[in-house]
């Protein structure tokens, strides 16, 4: 149990000494020295973690905890291709996907980098053909729209990257196709996408590891029916469909030529898969060179994580700060606030990455864990969040650690805008740390004590600030890899498997017979609430079918 470790118990005692300490006092005493001690750069990212409820002793104890928990040993096992995903008996080697051609990564004794780069070469050639107009639809039309059909890791990661790098869509001189992402089995998602498109100019990527994912295959079948209804012959569907999968036979049975299938491997978890052929949509959206730079940025962060000492290791520092707040301050949520509209989907991506990885209550040895694991992760882009939930972050009864992320140069420039954006980002972090006291309000001339009470900001609320010079594919890759490794570090400390997701399985199993009940006459065994919901829905569905 992590709670049995010496450093864990030392941190419990240390936490008691900091309960009433104020960050503003530390800044008043230490000034620039504190910032120098609590900041570092790696792979194009600058991290300032000085606005945290930490002292040098805190960080020393957190690094001791990381060492005692085996972060270094577990990290090295991951990079060595060991089967650290124990419940599925698989290696976890997404880091190999972004390694250069000469790198040596093996799974079960087999070198995997050559196969990875063969797939990358196919992705490069295919994306070049589509973006240049050489790939034609059934009637010889150029492809102007691409739909990525997938869910979870087959959607969130590629969608986030395509949004973040949309300013580079035409950077290689080609007119990029418009990108559309469909994930929800709710037919509205697909229908509202198709209604805007010309089937003769549309290409569909069906993205599913097993090619059996319920939502993805339902949407894929409906998309195929749309093409056929528009006059595209079955034999011509190959010009409008490609697959990203590990299941060649299922791809063939669906009607997609296996020659148009881009493979990946079962040692890649869905939420870590955007670096693989799952990122095919990224190559179509911004070009293969940008995708290659994304991989290089991720690899740069991998090398930092693999080689930097714990106390100067950015993923380790962020991971251990997360443990500090979750387990010693008992804070149940954390907020991601990117001050960049281009990064507006990053909080949703991070939500899946952290909560699906570390939302566990059982240790690797099968024992129930005796402490908290993943916080609830949420957030939106700034400055929008300031006019929604920042009231709670500043004055609510629950402290919420915040990660601010901002590019110093905007992807798209309008005079005067970016200075305002950055000013708000830095001001929010400062206000969270420093707060505003009753005495300061009185000194400003306020005399109404009731109003003063409402205007007091306690401050002492923690945040990290991550800056990048500008939002390039390279630095975006580093940012994503940073949070991947941060999540991994926390999972090691909690002694959980961050690479399975059994919690999503039971609902899928129960949904199958319920669907049959909704569309037929069968009646299953359910609790009274679920039975009543099924009966109500079935009555409405039958009435609609009869009308």
Swiss-Prot record:
What is one cellular component GO term in this UniProt entry?
Answer: cytosol
Give the active-site positions.
356, 387, 508
Enzyme class name: isomerase
- Reaction(s) catalyzed by this protein? alpha-D-glucose 6-phosphate = beta-D-fructose 6-phosphate
- Give the source's domain of life in one word: Bacteria
Q: A biological process (GO) annotation for this entry?
A: glucose 6-phosphate metabolic process
Task: List locations, semicolon-separated.
Answer: Cytoplasm
Which key words are in the record? Cytoplasm, Gluconeogenesis, Glycolysis, Isomerase
Pathway given for this chain reads: Carbohydrate biosynthesis; gluconeogenesis; Carbohydrate degradation; glycolysis; D-glyceraldehyde 3-phosphate and glycerone phosphate from D-glucose: step 2/4
The UniProt record lists the EC number as 5.3.1.9
- Gene Ontology molecular-function annotations: carbohydrate derivative binding; glucose-6-phosphate isomerase activity; monosaccharide binding
Record-linked HAMAP family = G6P_isomerase
Q: State the family it belongs to.
A: Belongs to the GPI family.
Q: What does this protein do?
A: Catalyzes the reversible isomerization of glucose-6-phosphate to fructose-6-phosphate.
Q: What is this protein called?
A: Glucose-6-phosphate isomerase
**Source species, please?**
Cupriavidus taiwanensis (strain DSM 17343 / BCRC 17206 / CCUG 44338 / CIP 107171 / LMG 19424 / R1) (Ralstonia taiwanensis (strain LMG 19424))
Gene name? pgi
């Amino acid at each position: 149990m992590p709670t049995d470790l010496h450093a864990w118990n030392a941190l419990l005692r240390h936490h008691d000494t900091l309960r009433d300490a104020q960050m503003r006092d530390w800044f008043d005493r230490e000034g620039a020295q504190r910032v120098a001690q609590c900041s570092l750069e790696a792979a194009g990212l600058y991290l300032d973690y000085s606005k945290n409820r930490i002292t040098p002793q805190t960080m020393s104890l957190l690094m001791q905890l990381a060492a005692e928990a085996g972060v270094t040993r577990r990290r090295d096992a991951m990079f060595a291709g060991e089967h650290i995903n124990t419940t599925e008996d698989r290696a976890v080697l997404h880091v190999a996907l972004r390694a250069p051609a000469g790198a040596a990564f093996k799974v079960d004794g087999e070198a995997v980098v050559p196969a990875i780069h063969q797939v990358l070469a196919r992705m490069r050639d295919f994306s070049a053909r589509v973006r240049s107009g050489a790939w034609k639809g059934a009637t010889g039309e150029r492809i102007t729209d691409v739909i990525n059909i997938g869910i979870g890791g087959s959607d969130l990661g590629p969608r986030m990257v395509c949004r973040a790098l949309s300013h580079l869509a035409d950077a290689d001189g080609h007119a990029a196709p418009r990108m559309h992402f469909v994930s929800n089995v709710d037919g509205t998602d697909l229908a509202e996408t198709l209604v805007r498109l010309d089937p003769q100019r549309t290409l569909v990527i069906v993205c599913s590891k097993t090619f059996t994912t319920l939502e993805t295959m339902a949407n894929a079948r409906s998309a195929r029916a749309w093409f056929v209804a528009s006059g595209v012959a079955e034999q011509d569907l190959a010009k409008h469909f490609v697959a990203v999968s590990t299941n060649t036979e299922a791809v063939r049975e669906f009607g997609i030529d296996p020659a148009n299938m881009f493979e990946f491997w079962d040692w890649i978890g869905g939420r870590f898969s955007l670096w693989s052929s799952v990122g095919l949509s990224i190559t179509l959206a911004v070009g293969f060179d940008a995708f290659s730079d994304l991989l290089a940025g991720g690899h740069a962060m991998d090398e930092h994580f693999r080689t930097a000492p714990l106390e100067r290791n950015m993923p380790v520092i962020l991971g251990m700060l997360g443990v500090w707040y979750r387990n010693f301050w008992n804070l149940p949520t954390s907020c991601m606030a990117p001050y960049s509209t281009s990064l507006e989907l990053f909080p949703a991506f991070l939500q899946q990455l952290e909560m699906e990885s570390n939302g566990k209550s059982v240790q690797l040895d099968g024992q129930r864990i005796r402490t908290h694991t993943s916080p609830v992760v949420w957030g939106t882009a700034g400055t929008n969040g300031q006019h929604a939930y920042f009231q709670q972050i500043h004055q609510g009864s629950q402290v919420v650690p915040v990660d601010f992320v901002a590019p110093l140069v905007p992807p798209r420039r309008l005079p005067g805008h970016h200075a305002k954006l950055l000013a708000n980002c830095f001001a929010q972090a400062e206000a969270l740390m420093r707060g505003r006291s009753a005495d300061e309000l009185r000194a400003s001339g306020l005399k109404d004590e009731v109003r003063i009470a409402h205007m007091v900001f306690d401050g002492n609320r923690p945040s990290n600030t991550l800056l990048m010079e500008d939002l390039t594919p390279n630095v975006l890759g580093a940012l994503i890899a940073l949070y991947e490794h941060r999540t991994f570090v926390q999972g090691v400390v909690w002694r959980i498997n961050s690479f399975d997701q059994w919690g999503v399985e039971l609902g899928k199993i129960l949904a199958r017979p319920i669907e049959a009940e909704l569309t037929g006459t069968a009646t299953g065994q359910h609790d009274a609430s679920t039975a009543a919901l099924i009966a109500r829905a079935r009555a409405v569905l039958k009435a609609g079918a009869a009308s």
